[in-house]
């Protein structure tokens, strides 16, 4: 099975070390362009663009990177409860059209009550997933060309439709990650690819089996992906030394503050990540070559595969054997580590290198009439 390898645009900051300004670098348009173009040339399938108040806006960053790349896809966040499904569908179709079919979408329900309140969202964990399920039903149908009337607990729309369809048919793929039961239920019913953070293989296997069974109950099949950091070097010793350097400026106070902040979220996945290290610097290799040091101060993906190219490739293939075909990777600093992965890891994997999409013929149409319908050229009889 060929693997889809993604990279990451660090719109929330980048550098050589975690938890310090030492070795940090400014993340501006030029730097993001460097990373995107490197990922494009190396052969990554796409890049994940993070979302949240500590990040630049993912949609604007993706739009800015489209003209400077050729084949790279952009995985951007859909935020139910923050934006309506109708507006989100129009945005998604536009991004897909502007990129000639290089748009992918990641459903993000949110987990930080403080950040959500700042965005005007006051739903609890279960309610957010209810709203996300309703949002996704409407969003999918609109992109598939339906005119949608929907009456739900959280979402109500009447005669909603898109005038400009996406390039990818029937619609761009939808990604989603969540570890709770309600999250898995949503994935089983609605999404195309279920994501997990980088837990040990036995834990990932359990989640995959649960989601696969729930999807089968809906008569569906779901693909699987995993989100991991990587530290790959020419030798295993060099890789582990690089891992130690990454957290060499962390002090106990910074770790404690980070863990206290992350504990406030209601994310089951975040709590599972925290349980892998329990805020302690000792015994961070939680599974062969799987290192939990990143999670001492970083929310979300908190583990890294560490080793030389053949070793990291072997661990990736262990996850692939569980049914995972997509790997969303990152490493510090993201520009240099992209090249490390391309040069030291890619040769040891069966990597699906994306092709440059060819221009597609556009449908002839006139200006919208009274904002109600679009005149189109009719076939001659």
UniProtKB/Swiss-Prot annotation:
Swiss-Prot/TrEMBL catalytic activity: an alkanesulfonate + FMNH2 + O2 = an aldehyde + FMN + sulfite + H2O + 2 H(+)
Origin: domain of life: Bacteria
Recorded GO MF terms: alkanesulfonate monooxygenase activity
One Pfam family in the UniProt entry: Bac_luciferase
InterPro entries hit by this protein: Alkanesulphonate_mOase_FMN-dep, Luciferase-like_dom, Luciferase-like_sf, SsuD_RutA_monooxygenase
GO biological process, one term: alkanesulfonate catabolic process
Keyword Flavoprotein attributed: yes
HAMAP family recorded: Alkanesulf_monooxygen
Further remarks about this protein from its record: FMNH(2) which is absolutely required for this enzymatic reaction, is provided by SsuE.
Subunit structure: Homotetramer.
Name of this chain's protein: Alkanesulfonate monooxygenase
Gene expressing this chain: ssuD
